[in-house]
Amino acid sequence: AVTILLGDAVVEAGRLVPIGMADPLADHPFVAALAASPFVPPAPDGVDRGELRELVRRGDVIEEEGIFYAASAIEEAARLAARLLDDEPEGFTVSAFREAAGNTRKHTMPLLSHLDSTGVTRRREDVRIAGPRLPDA
């Protein structure tokens, strides 16, 4: 009923948006920068905090331990974990993931933490093993 009263507007992701209005965050340069460097993401220097919060809320950007990743980087990390587990079914180490991702421990640990928390991997002592949501390699 509200949209009838407001005329040319639709509800998208819980927000009222005028029809024909471009999404100002659709092609945000920070998301592009994160996607261009998936495993060594840049810091959000100069990114408006409100825009950053909205990008995280929408799922375009994932924050883990203060590091921001493109959603596509998380998917890529899950595929990398699957490939590592194809080679080492008993589990892979943090070091193996870090070397395969070409990044540092600073960026590896938040990625692995996210994969563990979403069921892609599970931590067993010093290795990561397949979780129930591990994708195909």
Predicted segments with their positions:
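C-terminal non-catalytic scaffold/interaction domains in large multidomain proteins
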Residues: 1-137
